[in-house]
Amino acid sequence: MKLITRALFLKALPASVLLTGFSSLLLSGAVSAQDSAPTFYADALPLFQKNCVACHQPDGPKVGGITAPMSLMDYDQAKLWAPMIKNALITGYMPPWGAHERHRGEFKDERYIEDNELATLVAWVDGGALEGKPADAADQSGQIAEAGGTVLPDSGWWIGDPDLVVQFDRPVYVKDDIMDWQPTVQMPVPEGAHTEPKWVSKAELAPGGPWVHHIVSSHMGVGVPGRGPFTYPEGWGVLMPEDPFITVNMHYHKDPGEGTAITDMTRAGFVFYEDGTVIDHVVETNLLPHSGWTIPPGDPNFEVTNTHEIEEDIYLLSMGPHMHYRGKAMRYEVEYPDGERETLLWVPDYDFNWQFLYEYQEPKFLPAGSVMHMSWWFDNSTQNRWNPDYTAAVEYGPETTDEMANARIYYAPTTKRGIVVGNDIPADILETARKEEQNRRERANLLDQSQDDFAWLTEDSD
């Protein structure tokens, strides 16, 4: 299915948005059109182009497996959705972005809408969602280009034309009775396509659909619905050793029951650095998970904390908080060696449906001896509409109905390596990259031996 249905979109909206939305629909119909009221072409469209059309465009592209339910470049669709647009905006549901306003300007691809822009769009809806004259609109393609390259390239990949594309040998079949499943699967590399180690500059995961809860790979990082591609800063990269397979850990989550089986053909694309490029910083990642706690039944604000010491000078590239349905808020802080404390990331309203990677505009220096303080808050009460079971005592676990308290970071030591792409690769880096892939492959073998049913390996998905 190309587009998410309107019903599915409405199901995902908070109840307050729906109630206010339909009330707004009744009220907006009673508002008389005035000559001074904003119009779609003159007022709303430019703001949609600036803030929304990265997803909400004709034949909207998938961003991490999610497709927007309508195009906001089309007047008829925008008018139909106008009440929902207003309330998604005023409640902060859209544009989707978790980082607090205090972080404005710190992270790439941030999604904040200005107060005056919000007021204009609300006035457009309240004024009857008037069309206006198409001649009042500026050149659409020009505005989209100025908005930061929000049009999907002809290649179908946000990273442009990949140097390498891998996918499953055949679709993965997730049966009716499965709700959560975490197979570790190998994606074969096309013969002759990857015969020597390569430095990755860009990587994009294309989940087969919203039932893909996450994808983990040594070379691609972590992919979840709604998260875009990895594009490393100039001089930063990840080494992909030559190998006939790319091993990925998949986590599928869906409602079980008759007729719910799905087939998945997740893909991944890579762009490599050209020979002669200098790699100064080899990207490393740390999940920083924390377990050993239990969320009491009905607790609306359960807090979990953990610390992590920085043992060498590093540049912090990005942060990716991760919880499940009971996740409420998350904070990263750093305590410097002199005792000064700074908030690195504050996500006051965590949304399981939008799991962003917050990448700094410029990598942030953290000196050796600094201590990271991580805090997670969970809502296990009836007030949490996503809560699978408020009567359960919840612990850290792999199922989506369990919980997690992860604080993934991407970083690199500050010491420059000066590795020239195309020349010999330092032995320590090559050994580490090969070991990571081998460890993941061994876990795949262990999974094969322990799973009772691997019908998807042979079952016809037609």
Where are these regions (language model features)?
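Bacterial N-terminal signal peptides
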Residues: K11-S28
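Aromatic- and Gly/Pro-enriched helix-to-coil junctions and flexible linker segments
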Residues: V31-P190, T195, K202, G208, ...
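Extended, polar beta-sheet/loop recognition surfaces of beta-rich domains
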Residues: M73-Y93, W386-A392, T415, V420-V421, ...
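Short, charged low-complexity linker/loop segments at the C-terminal edge of domains
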Residues: A129-K133, G276-I279, T414-D428
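Intrinsically disordered, low-complexity segments enriched in small/polar and acidic residues
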Residues: A145, V421, L430-A433, E437-S450, ...
